[in-house]
Structures are given as C-alpha cells and as structure tokens.
Amino acid sequence: MARTFTSIVELQGAMQQCCTVAIQNACEILLAELQRLIRSEFYDQYTPTMYNRTYQFLESATKEMVTDLCGRVFMDADRMNYLEPHWTGEVQLEAANNSVHGGILVNGGRYWDSFMEYCNANALNILKQELRKQGLNVR
C-alpha cells in the first residue's frame, strides 16, 4: 500500500520504524540459528552421567535491541548460575565452544565459531529480506 508523506521527518520516521522491525526480525532469525547450533553442536554431542542438565547454557542465548537501528544476538553469561563457584557463565561459554562438557572433552562442534560463520555468510541477506518484507526496496 502506497503512503504519502508531507515532510522529510514523516518519511524518516516511517523508514526508521520499518528498519527497526526488520532488525528485530533478523535478530530473531539469527537467535533461532544460534539455539539450533547449540543443540546440535553441544547438547546432541554428549549425554551427561555425573550431572543433570539445567539448560541454562541454551537459555543464555539472547537478543536485544541496542538502539532503534542496532540489534545484537549474544550469549549472556550472567544468565548462568552453576553450583560450582569456579564454573561461571564465562567459563561455560568458553568451554562449550571448545567441546568441553562438565569438564570432559568430547568430539563436538564449536557452536560460536559455527554461528559466526553462519552470520558472516547469511546475516546481511537475512536483513535485506526482512527490510523487503517491510516494503523497502533493498539491493
């Protein structure tokens, strides 16, 4: 549906709103891929026998809008709280990317490295697609 704007300010506001929605949607798509990679390259690689999974690691994958036009997908180390005081969220993030499960090295994937590869190959196209869905002509 075509819209008519009577000022540059109206046009800018409408375009900013379209961009904000597109960025939010792109972050959601990227977050889903990060969670898929965590499942396939971490959780599916090892079944613990000495501890019960809490899934805090999976749930620490998150997204947020930094500004109206900037979003990020990241692992929030502060969302993890393990019983061992030396095993912090930061330690878990590093260990998981090195295929370490509960202190045991297994043949697993490197979820973060895989996610970075995915983002480098796909994030721009995902954003362009989401901008087009908002009605913006993007090449």
Give the residues covered by each predicted segment.
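Short, Lys/Arg-rich flexible segments
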Residues: M1-F74, Q92-R139
